[in-house]
Amino acid sequence: MHPPFPQPTVVRADHDDPDRPLVVLLHGRGSDETGIIGLSQHLPADHSYVAVRAPIPAGGGFAWFANRGIGRPVPESLDQTMAWFRDWLDPLAPVGRPVMLVGFSGGAAFAGGLLLADPSRFAGAAILYGTLPFEAGVPTTPGRLAGAPVFLAHGEADTVIPADLLHRTWDYLLGDSGADTYARKDPGGHAITSEAAAELADWIMKRS
């Protein structure tokens, strides 16, 4: 059982069509759903898009988990918020409807946690300018994501996410995880670039 988090607050890009693949957008720590929903304007129109507000108040916005440090979730907290998220997702997208996760920063760690916890549940995940949740109660063993589609984008000048976590995420997703990873590095910092958004759109379209 997870704590009594509020019912998820969501914003949709358009009317949800249950016959379309669902793309769930996950914002960064201290932000909310209203910022990241704009990314959907740059992504394929034949998908349904929904942005979800994280359940934990943090920094004038919201967070997906309690931290032991930037990019390092408290395992119990991550487990609780993932259970809360799945309680919301499963009625909306029963097994059989493709679901892709797109997470930025703290939302990337949350998306990674969901994928690592249950790789077969998701049609893919985009890890944007963030880290996977290592030592956070989800498996990061060799082959854990065998064949799973992953889009990975990092900024070479990112000063928000610790460099060791960025390197570890890059190495794992392009190596031991077994994921089918498309990866790019931008010269900039901790922000989604227009080039990354365009490549993400192409990646989503090719996996529909």
Give the residues covered by each predicted segment.
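Serine-hydrolase catalytic machinery in alpha/beta-hydrolase-like enzymes
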Residues: 2-95
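Short, proline-enriched alpha-helix->beta-strand connector loops that line the catalytic pocket
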Residues: 20, 97, 145-150, 179-180
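Active-site signature of alpha/beta-hydrolase-fold catalytic machinery across serine-
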Residues: 38, 113-117
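Flexible "cap/lid" loop of the alpha/beta hydrolase fold
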Residues: 61-68, 130-150
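Gly/Ala-rich beta-loop-alpha elbow adjacent to hydrolase catalytic centers
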Residues: 102-107, 111
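A conserved short beta-strand
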Residues: 120-133
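Short beta-strand/loop motif that positions the catalytic acidic residue
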Residues: 151-154, 158
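C-terminal catalytic histidine-bearing segment of alpha/beta-hydrolase fold enzymes
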Residues: 164-208
